[in-house]
């Protein structure tokens, strides 16, 4: 069966998440329900809620429309609220994304260049 509609355009993120699982303390991961938060949803939340970018600025950084950014924010926030209120684990995985090349990523813009894989390869 072929897929119809427009192909999904990858969203740009600055880096892979440092941690992929968050869960309630004192409970095994196998004992709790899980919420899947996509990497691009996390990036949208990071840019708007944590770094205080406007939705317009964040959408430009991610290479998406404001409407798509709004959808990512809405879904991501809903999933995080569900996990916090109902004691579920948050698993960060999936999504349509690409890591932005050095020179555009947030760390590079703030002068921290040694993190970049391409920078390390030049040494």
UniProtKB/Swiss-Prot annotation:
Q: What is this protein called?
A: UPF0251 protein MJ1243
Species assigned in the record: Methanocaldococcus jannaschii (strain ATCC 43067 / DSM 2661 / JAL-1 / JCM 10045 / NBRC 100440)
Q: Which HAMAP family match?
A: UPF0251
* Protein family membership: Belongs to the UPF0251 family.
């Amino acid at each position: 069966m072929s897929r119809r509609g427009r192909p999904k355009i990858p969203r740009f993120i600055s880096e892979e998440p440092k941690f992929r699982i968050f869960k309630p303390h004192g409970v095994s991961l196998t004992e709790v329900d899980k919420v899947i938060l996509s990497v691009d949803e996390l990036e949208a939340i990071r840019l708007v809620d944590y770094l205080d970018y406007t939705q317009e600025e964040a959408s430009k950084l991610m290479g998406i429309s404001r409407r798509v950014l709004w959808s990512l924010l809405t879904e991501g926030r809903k999933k995080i609220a569900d996990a916090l209120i109902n004691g579920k684990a948050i698993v960060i995985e999936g999504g349509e994304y690409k890591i932005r090349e050095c020179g555009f990523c947030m760390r590079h813009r703030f002068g921290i260049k040694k993190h970049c894989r391409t920078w390390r390869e030049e040494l």
